[in-house]
Amino acid sequence: MGMIGAFFDFDKTLLETESAKLGFQYLWERRLISFGFLLRILIANFFYQRHLLSDEFVGRIFLKFYRGKKLEEFTNGAPLFYRQYLKPRLAPNILCKVREHQKNGHVLILISGSVRYLLEPVIEDIGFDHLLCTDLEVGADGQLTGRANGPFCINKTKRTLASHLAQKHGIDLSRSYAYGNHQSDIPLLEMVGFPFAVEPTEPLRKVAFKRNWPILGFK
């Protein structure tokens, strides 16, 4: 009999808001981002929230910010950013679920389209066993290219990565749990025995009702 896993999405699931939004707010307050680029982000997010742009399209826009920069610029500040911006906005009810799974000895996996340097302080503080996420591409010159290194960890890619991890570590998906908020999380949610929709978008809410998936709130 395999181990039981618990897969948690991050943005608007374990975190009550979007980590990228907080990240760009942090950069804007420190004058590290131009008004023009911030405007592009706001416009893209406006259309994304209305389901008019895909996760990957918006993700590509976000990642262009990193082009020509050093990864160390961001990894060095990530722990402070987590403590000041992310940790105070963790969803109490979902964090409680994480603790329940920890208590029961389940394998904890944080799975998110967000970038690795933002999420590493999260898994270290909370105690996740594995992290599946989007990686930034580093060029031959040691600078970030503004692209992802591999696929974005979204949609069906989440399912693929989760499946590979489960096979590698002996996780029984039929006895495992998954938590997500967005219709793009459906491929992940439907692969486990116990899926949960967290403050779901309307498309995910409809699927959850149809399939009798429990719906959870942040608090």
Where are these predicted regions, by residue range?
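Active-site neighborhood of HAD-like aspartate-dependent phosphohydrolases
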Residues: 1-50
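C-terminal cap/substrate-recognition subdomain and adjoining C-terminal extension
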Residues: 2-3, 76, 83-219
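Conserved alpha/beta cores of soluble small-molecule-handling proteins
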Residues: 4, 32, 49, 53, ...
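A general structural signal for well-ordered alpha-helical segments in protein cores
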Residues: 20-21, 59, 159
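N-terminal alpha-helical segment
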Residues: 38-40, 55-58
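Active-site phosphate/ATP/adenylate-binding loop shared across adenylate-forming ligases
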Residues: 49, 65-69, 136
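Metal-dependent phosphoesterase signature
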Residues: 57-93
